[in-house]
Amino acid sequence: MVEFKSFIKNENLRIISLLAFILPTLTVLISYFLSIKYNYVIFCIPNIEGCTSISQVGRYPPVNYFFKIFMFVSIFLIFLYWIFNYVLISKKGLLLIHKLTFFLGILSVIFFSLYIIFLGEGDYYRFFRRIGIFIYIFFTVISELLLSISYKKNSYLFKND
C-alpha cells in the first residue's frame, strides 16, 4: 500500500490545484445555464452587469442538487490542496508560519462548507451565507498570501523538486 506522504508530490499538487479551480468554475457556469433554463435567473453577463450571484444560481431545485454536490467535491479538493501544501513544506522542515497558513486554509474550507450548506431563501440563510462567504474569502486570501511568501522565501529548497 502506498503511504499517503509518498503520494504527495509537486505534480499531484499541480493537478489538485487545477482541479480545485476548474471544477467550481464549471459548476457555477453549468448551474448558471441550468438556472436560466428553469427561469430562476435572467440571461445576462453577471460579471459585467451584476444581474445575479453565485448563491442565486445554486439556490433552487433541481439546480441546487447539482450545484451542492459538485461544490462539496470542490471543497474536498481545496482541503486536499492545503494538506498537500502542508506536507510538502513540512518535508523541508518549514513549520512555524506554515502551521498558521494551514490552519487558516482549513478554516476557509470550513466556512466555504457553511456557505454551501446555507444556500436557501430567507434572512436566516442570507445571514449565514454572507458570514460564510466573507470569512471564506478573508481566510483564503490571508492563507494564500502566507503560502506564497513561504514558497518565495524558501524557493531555494524547492529547486530540485
What are these regions (language model features)?
Residues N10, V87-L100, K153-D161:
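Membrane-interface helix-boundary motifs at transmembrane edges
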